[in-house]
UniProtKB/Swiss-Prot annotation:
Organism expressing this protein natively: Mus musculus (Mouse)
Name of the protein in its database record: Beta-1,4-galactosyltransferase 2
Binding site for Mn(2+): D215, H308
Membrane-spanning intervals of the chain: 16-36
Reactions the enzyme catalyzes: D-glucose + UDP-alpha-D-galactose = lactose + UDP + H(+); an N-acetyl-beta-D-glucosaminyl derivative + UDP-alpha-D-galactose = a beta-D-galactosyl-(1->4)-N-acetyl-beta-D-glucosaminyl derivative + UDP + H(+); N-acetyl-D-glucosamine + UDP-alpha-D-galactose = beta-D-galactosyl-(1->4)-N-acetyl-D-glucosamine + UDP + H(+)
Cofactor: Mn(2+)
Polar residues bias (residue ranges): 58-73
Family: Belongs to the glycosyltransferase 7 family.
Pathway participation: Protein modification; protein glycosylation
Residue span of region Disordered: 58-90
Enzyme Commission (EC) number: 2.4.1.-, 2.4.1.38, 2.4.1.22, 2.4.1.90
Primary location: Golgi
């Protein structure tokens, strides 16, 4: 009897143990199945964008691109659609050789040239004589500076021919007429120093400066009014000199220097009152600072000069030859750093900016030099 009871208990224990083992296996299988389902559920969230992770039902229940769409059913705030704004057009750089150049230009000074006509011919030129090409981005910003007094007739011809030419050259430029006030002796180089400073006050972006006499008009638009690695002399073949360079060191008429080149030579001399000498002094400054003159081909650098009598109060400077010999010393103290003047008026005209200045008066001839 006891053996029978013992055998029965043994079978019962084995059965209970088997059931416990079976229960454990089922629990383990269910655990891993639930874990796999949770893992798959959360992996779907991790692959969505942050907006979808925060609002998983927004993309399917709300059409935010429609003005009358609503998110009330989902309980989410309405979000306006993010429409791409207009992109600014990419303006390419201006070509080295502008495509609209015509080459040789016929220049004549016989027909009347009213300023109103010149203004009608140049509708793209802004107030103050500023212009920038609409279809390309120039590499330089050019200030054209004209020393001036009592030459309104010449200025109208200059504006008539130069504005169309500069626009064909795809320049970003401004024209500044530096008008010497009063009837004291004329001082061309000092007016050019004033023009350099006043142009930079208006626009610090100027990095190229063209210094032009008002009575000189280029005969070829391939004579590009730009600055290069060396100072540039543009007017190398004037009709006045038989379309030849008068002498090797001549730097008169029309010239161009970058801002860095101009500052390197301390600008132009201020003490050349009257006609002559300042161009040769400028040439000496360029040579003494280790730079060389760059010039266009003689067939391109041709100019016509408007014939006129010599201006009153612009007599030849009797001290000019002595001064030229002393450039090495005088350029250290006489130049852009020592120029003194007073601006009387700044007037922005349709085709140019007129700056009237008082530049003082010369010392007596006995104390000059």
């Amino acid at each position: 009897m006891s053996r029978l009871l013992g055998g029965t208990l043994e079978r019962v224990c084995k059965a209970v143990l088997l059931l416990c083992l079976l229960h454990f296996l089922v629990a383990v299988i269910l655990y891993f199945d639930v874990y796999a389902q949770h893992l798959a559920f959360f992996s779907r969230f991790s692959t969505r964008s942050p907006a979808h992770a925060l609002y998983p039902a927004a993309s399917s229940s709300t059409n935010c691109s429609r003005p009358n769409a609503t998110a009330a059913s989902s309980g989410l705030p309405e979000v306006p659609s993010a429409r791409p704004g207009p992109t600014a057009p990419v303006i390419p750089p201006c070509p080295d050789v502008p495509p609209g150049l015509v080459g040789r230009v016929v220049i004549e000074f016989t027909s009347p040239m009213p300023l109103e006509r010149v203004q009608r011919e140049n509708p793209g030129v802004l107030l103050g004589g500023r212009y920038s090409p609409p279809d390309c981005t120039p590499a330089q910003t050019v200030a054209v500076i004209i020393p001036f007094r009592h030459r309104e007739h010449h200025l109208r011809y200059w504006l008539h021919y130069l504005h169309p030419m500069l626009r064909r050259q795809r320049l970003r430029y401004g024209v500044y007429v530096i008008n010497q006030h009063g009837e004291e002796t004329f001082n061309r180089a000092k007016l050019l120093n004033v023009g350099f400073l006043e142009a930079l006050k208006e626009d610090a972006a100027y990095d190229c400066f063209i210094f032009s006499d008002v009575d000189l008009v280029p005969m070829d638009d391939r004579n590009l009014y730009r600055c290069g690695d060396q100072p540039r002399h543009f007017a190398i073949a004037m009709d006045k000199f038989g379309f030849r360079l008068p002498y090797a060191s001549y730097f008169g008429g029309v010239s161009g220097l970058s801002k860095a080149q101009f500052l390197r030579i301390n600008g132009f001399p201020n003490e050349y009152w009257g006609w002559g000498g300042e161009d040769d002094d400028i040439f000496n400054r360029i040579s003494l600072t280790g730079m060389k003159i760059s010039r266009p081909d003689v067939r391109i650098g041709r100019y016509r000069m408007i014939k006129h009598d010599r201006d009153k109060h612009n007599e030849p400077n009797p001290q000019r030859f002595n001064k030229i010999q002393n450039t090495k010393m005088s350029m250290k103290w006489d130049g852009i750093g020592s120029v003194r003047y007073r601006v009387l008026e700044v007037s922005r005209q349709p085709l140019f900016t007129n700056i009237t200045v008082d530049i003082g008066q010369p010392m007596s001839w006995l104390t000059q030099g």
